[in-house]
């Protein structure tokens, strides 16, 4: 836009290039109305999406064009209403230098400047708290030390002082605990035991952060208790480090066994050969700490098992990784952008973003995390909020639309599961997103695999084909749909399914932009992050009903389908189906240790975890009104580790599994 709020919008039509002259006709702190001058077109933009320089020029011209006292005051008021306190403050400070101001005017302006400084300082404190919550401790500590003090209220400065005090307190506590632990280790008589304890100590000292410090809470409580032998206090530190403070133990042999078990688990998860995995498993079974309960705790508190590749040159925290999704197909690739101060022992929320057919994975990461600056760092919303961004390259050359295929699902799911093994991802906060055809894919994959996602964000995407039959699956995964009023037939195409969602009270948010067409909608990004902050995956749904029509849409929470009947399967190449009959899967957990399942496949695998099963009590599982024999079901470390190898979820692995026939028709060929 120029200073008069006009621009030329150029688009390609079937008649060639078309230039549309537009002008800003209404400017509010929330939205900007833009209308066509040469053509009929009425659209809305978020005012925050206008560059600061452009906004200032337009405001100045709208207020009369002359930067006099009243004009600058009007601009400052507008900026305050937008929440841009720093910009308003600069405007008023510039105004104070105007010689024609009277003393009363200067006093009034100085009072406004003081109030703006408080608002700006308060928002800076809120920003620092958000960055602290995102794990950016060094950045926050540095900014707290440089926090402006001139003209800032004592209440805010006291809050800053308390935040700095928390840092100093944690730093002193960490050094004190390390010193005490080191001293206790040196009192252990047995040399091999002392050496192994020293090895663990070096790891703790290297990885002790504000996120890992709570693991030593049990040790901190009893570190000075002289009634406990040094070995027991050391055991509290080592076991707490491996399992978390709530599971800390006093027996040093068991604590050291946990440390060895963790190393063997790491070897197991990285070993590709079955025979070698069995050898590792035998060594594991000889360890006292190799129970399913201990192994689950270790998995939840260990580093990701697979190593990181080399960073891309001059691109901080950015990686490109190849992943095998099918042994008969060439590897697929995906990009990953890590947030600032990433640490492998902290869990991070994650965005899985799918590009359109005319865009790239790099552009998707740029949209969420910002572009690289000259220093090779990104300054964008994903890093600010502490999110990992994953962008699979899911399309093929010359592809013209989303194909709803096994290949597309396989590439995306393989990238996600490989990322689980390499990066410290909070598997309860993984969000699937997509633009354009990537939005079509996100809508389909979100409904096909609702148990994987904390939420699904579709931007300029379409609900089509399988989505029409899977719509009830949306009851179990939140959706955020962003679309433009003038994006062809998109709104009418999506209307039926959106009506179904909204009329039944599903957790669905729909943002429709007036006068906007096929657009990436970058002006919605702050609302998207606010929405994501409230969402979390239901990893063990107590009551769900889901539908499937493809052989690869075969897992829902703790149920996996095997041998689906041919009558319900409709491959994408056979669309549309003649007689669509989706397979129905129902799971209900009315009480602990009771599972009531309805499964339309011939065989099923039921995963069992501690969230809904107490393995010390009798287990009741009913499938299709038939009781399943569960007398021999016990937690098994091999089942647990194989589940982690396959699904990558180290936060909620299954401790045991039941594989059984269901009495339904088999999909196998004779």
Enumerate the language-model features and the residues they cover:
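C-terminal beta-sandwich/jelly-roll accessory domains of carbohydrate-active enzymes
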Residues: 550-670
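Short beta-strand/loop motif that positions the catalytic acidic residue
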Residues: 474, 480-483
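Primarily recognizes the serine-hydrolase "nucleophile elbow" in alpha/beta-hydrolase
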Residues: 421, 428-475
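A domain-start/cap signature at the N-terminus of enzymes
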Residues: 175-348, 638-650
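Compositionally biased alpha-helical segments
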Residues: 1-210, 636-670
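Active-site machinery of serine-nucleophile hydrolases
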Residues: 347-350, 354-421
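Gly/Ser-rich "nucleophile elbow"/oxyanion-hole loop immediately N-terminal to the catalytic nucleophile
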Residues: 340-346, 400-436, 448, 452
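C-terminal catalytic histidine-bearing segment of alpha/beta-hydrolase fold enzymes
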Residues: 488, 492-593, 600-603
């Amino acid at each position: 836009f120029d200073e008069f709020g006009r621009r030329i919008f150029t688009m390609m039509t079937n008649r060639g290039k078309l230039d549309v002259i537009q002008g800003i006709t209404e400017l509010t702190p929330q939205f900007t109305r833009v209308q066509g001058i040469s053509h009929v077109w009425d659209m809305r933009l978020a005012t925050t999406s206008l560059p600061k320089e452009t906004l200032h020029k337009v405001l100045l011209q709208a207020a009369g064009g002359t930067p006099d006292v009243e004009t600058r005051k009007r601009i400052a008021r507008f900026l305050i209403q937008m929440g841009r306190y720093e910009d308003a403050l600069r405007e008023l400070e510039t105004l104070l230098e105007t010689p024609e101001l009277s003393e009363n005017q200067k006093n009034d302006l100085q009072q406004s400047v003081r109030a703006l400084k408080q608002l700006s300082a308060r928002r800076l404190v809120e920003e620092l708290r958000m960055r602290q919550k995102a794990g950016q401790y060094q950045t926050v500590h540095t900014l707290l030390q440089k926090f402006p003090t001139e003209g800032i209220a004592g209440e805010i400065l006291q809050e800053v002082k308390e935040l700095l005090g928390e840092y100093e307190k944690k730093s002193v506590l960490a050094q004190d605990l390390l010193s005490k632990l080191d001293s206790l280790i040196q009192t252990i008589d047995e040399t091999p035991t002392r050496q192994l304890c020293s090895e663990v100590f070096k790891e703790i000292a290297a990885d002790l952060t504000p996120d890992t410090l709570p693991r030593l809470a049990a040790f901190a409580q009893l570190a000075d208790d002289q009634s406990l032998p040094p070995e027991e206090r050391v055991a509290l530190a080592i076991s707490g480090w491996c399992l978390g403070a709530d599971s800390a133990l006093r027996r040093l042999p068991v604590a050291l066994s946990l440390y060895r078990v963790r190393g063997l688990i790491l070897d197991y998860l990285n070993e590709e050969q079955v025979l070698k995995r069995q050898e590792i498993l035998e060594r594991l079974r000889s360890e006292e700490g190799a129970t399913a309960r201990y192994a689950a705790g270790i998995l939840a508190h260990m580093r990701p098992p697979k190593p990181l590749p080399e960073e891309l040159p001059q691109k901080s925290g950015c990686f490109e990784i190849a992943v095998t999704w099918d042994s008969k197909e060439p590897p697929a690739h995906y990009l990953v952008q890590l947030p600032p101060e990433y640490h492998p022992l902290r869990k991070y929320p994650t965005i899985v973003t799918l590009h359109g057919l005319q865009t790239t994975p790099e552009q998707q990461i740029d949209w969420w995390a910002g572009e690289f600056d000259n220093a090779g760092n990104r300054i964008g919303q994903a890093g600010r909020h502490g999110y990992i961004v994953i962008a699979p390259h899911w399309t093929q050359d010359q592809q013209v639309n989303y194909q709803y295929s096994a290949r597309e699902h396989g590439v995306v799911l393989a990238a996600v599961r490989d990322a689980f093994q390499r990066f410290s991802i909070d598997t309860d906060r993984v969000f699937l997103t997509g633009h354009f055809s990537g939005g079509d894919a996100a809508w389909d994959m979100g409904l096909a695999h609702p148990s994987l996602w904390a939420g699904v964000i579709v931007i300029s995407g379409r609900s089509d084909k399988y989505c029409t039959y899977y719509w009830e699956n949306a009851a179990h995964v939140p959706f955020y749909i962003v679309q433009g009023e003038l994006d062809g037939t998109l709104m009418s195409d999506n209307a039926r399914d959106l009506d179904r969602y909204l009329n039944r009270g599903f957790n669905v948010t729909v943002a429709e932009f007036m006068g906007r067409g096929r657009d990436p909608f970058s002006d919605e990004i702050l609302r998207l992050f606010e929405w994501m902050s409230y969402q979390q995956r239901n990893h063990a749904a107590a009551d769900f009903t889901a539908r499937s029509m493809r052989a690869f849409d075969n897992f829902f929470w703790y149920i996996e389908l095997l041998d689906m009947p041919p009558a319900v399967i409709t491959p994408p190449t056979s669309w549309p189906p003649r007689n669509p009959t989706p397979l129905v899967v129902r799971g209900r957990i009315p009480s602990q240790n009771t599972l009531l399942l309805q499964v339309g496949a011939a065989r099923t695998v039921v995963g069992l975890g501690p969230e809904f099963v107490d393995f010390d009590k009798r287990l009741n599982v009913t499938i299709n009104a038939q009781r399943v024999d569960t007398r021999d079901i016990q937690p098994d470390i091999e089942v647990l580790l194989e589940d982690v190898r396959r699904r990558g979820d180290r936060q909620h692995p299954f401790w045991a599994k039941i594989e059984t026939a269901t009495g339904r028709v088999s999909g196998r060929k004779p």
